[in-house]
Structure formats: C-alpha cells, structure tokens
Amino acid sequence: MTKACYVGVAGKARKVKKIYTGVANKARKVKKAYVGVGGVARPFFSAESKLSYYGTVTPLDDGRAYFQATSVGGYGLFGGGYAGKILSTVDAYSTSLVHSTPTSLSEVRYDLAATTVGNYALFGGGHTTDSTTEDDIFLPTVDAYSTSLVRNTPTELGERRAVLAATTVGNYGLFGGGYLILKNMSYISFPTVDAYSASLVRSTPASLSEAKYGLAATTVGDFGLFGGGNDRYHEASSVVDAYSATLVRSTPTALSEARNNLAATSVGGYALFGGGNGSDTVNAYSTTLVRSTPSVLSEERHNMAATTVGDYGLFGGGGFLRETQFSSTVDAYSSTLVRSTPTGLSFSRGGLAATTVGNYGLFGGGTNYNAYYITVDAYTVDGGG
C-alpha cells in the first residue's frame, strides 16, 4: 500500500514525491522508506506509483470507432473515425482534462494511424467513401497539429492506404504498412514505410520485410517496432520489423504466434504486443530486442486500445473472435511485466482509441456494433509519496 509523506513549506503541508540519499557521492532515489514504531518498521514513503480508475471525463464531441489518438505538448488528441458516417472531428484533452475541439482533419476518414514527432501530432492515411458512387477512397493525407493545436498539412504519404500503423523513433515519425481495395474488390497490401522528421520533411526508408496491414507499432529504446498484421495473402503474420533512430531496418525474433488486429504500447524498458484475433498472448521486447512472453491477457481479444500511464502499460476493451460480444477489461503491465487488472472501462466496447496526457491514460469512443460511443474513461497514477 502506498504511504504518504509530507513536509512543511511556507506553513503548508506538501506531499513528498521523491526522496534521494547520498551513496558513494551519488544521489540515489529512495524506493521505500520506513520508520520504527514500537519496535516495528512501518512504511512512511513509497516511490511506487499506484494505478487507479479515475472515472469518465467530458465525452467526445461525436461517438465513433476505428479512429486514432496521440498526444502533443499538453494535449491528448482523438481524430477521425466512423459512426455510420465518416468523421473528421478532432477532440483535445488538456493535462487537467479540459476538453476542446481544434480544427478538424482536412478530410473525413477512418482506419488511419497517428503518432507524434517533435512538436507535431500526425494523423496519416485512412479511407473515406465517394458520396456519389459509394466506392472506398483511400487517402495519403497527413495532418499535423502543433503544440498550440494549429493544423497544417505536410507532404502526403508515398502510397494511399488505410489500416496502417505508426510510431516514433529518434527524430522520425514512421507510418508503416496498410492496404487499399481496388474497384474489382481485390486488395493490395503495402510494405511501405514513410518517415517524417521533426520539421515534417518526408523520406522513405527501407520497406517492411513483408507487405501487411492490421499491424501494430510502438517504440522501445532506440527502436521503432512494427509487428503482426495480415500479409498480402490475408494470413496472420508474426514478423516484427525494427527501425533504428537512423532508420536502419532489422528483423528481431518474431512474435510467438501470428496474429492481426493486435495492440501495442511500451512500459519501462519493454515494448509490448498484446492480443489479436483469437489471442491472449503478450510478447515483450527489451531495449536490445530480446523477446520474452509475460503473463497472458486476462481475456483473448482484438481491436483493443493500448497506452501507458506512469509505470503501467494498459490494454483496454476489445472484441471476442466470432462473437458479437465485447470486453470492458483493462490489463495493466508494470515496468517489471507483472500483470494486474484494475477497474474496467465503464462499459464493454471495441474499436476504441487510447492516448496519455499528463498523468491520465484516456480510452475514448468505441462500438459494440449497436451504437458508437462518446465515452472517455480515464486512468491515473498517484505518483510517489
């Protein structure tokens, strides 16, 4: 149990967040501190953060699913999505969870990807529908939001595509994979990776080792990782591609099982790939790309959302294979890969999006196929002390 420690500052009790002690002329962080009471050691300080469910916050402007989220500066952003109609709405949440609606995306779209590089949040790719023919239109568009939420439109992706993934490594935001559907209803999947510098200059590093879509991406140490997905034959893939901070590609050990529609986030020194169609497996990659397999998710599910708050990587919501049932479960992995299950989402749903702003991890939107939701659930950590 986390204990509280206070110190007097200008006549007010202030909570102690961190304590350091000198060891061999170096400042070492105190993780736990005890005091003797009646001959028994009693804890009075812990630097370990405690994860808790904060509750629901101001809802999204539009209920929707199949959208994306990222953070820039002091804002968490949710952009695009589908709710029976295709949307361009962007919702912003400040570090104090104040909700606002900045300029919308330049085009309505869903099944897009998002990441942040430098001072810009990027939303790239996706698809929409021709209002006359009702044909799918796949988009190469990238919208960039500054730390003051001013939108601009940098160079497009090299290929128009949807169901791609994005992450950031070093000074580059990467968009990888994706697919488009031709008028004859055949699919083309892509191995393409587009890189955007902190000044939004686009380049094209080495492609993924295979064309695929429905993959997941995250970053650990000096590597951006793209894992899983469907290959060009629509079969689940286990391949993981790693990009260094200089955009050199390598292929570390594959996922322990092939899967698509999985989720990814990073915590401590680990990148986590969790779930996927019919899977409860979680694979962890260290900063040296050594793969391990921590405890499985508490339920096998796909179309989850994932984010990290404090020392916890969270996987929330999702659907069950071949069933019209959805989950409200949240699985939390600590920086030492210990799994716990905090209070779940306020209700079950899949196709949601997640990001973190300040001390809050936010899970927004989603669907259960009967409705599209505006709800945003927040998780927080209490910090040290």
Tell me the role of every PLM-derived stretch.
Residues 2-12, 21-22, 35-385:
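Kelch-like beta-propeller repeat domains
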Residues 30-32:
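Trimeric viral appendage architectures of receptor-binding fibers, tailspike depolymerases
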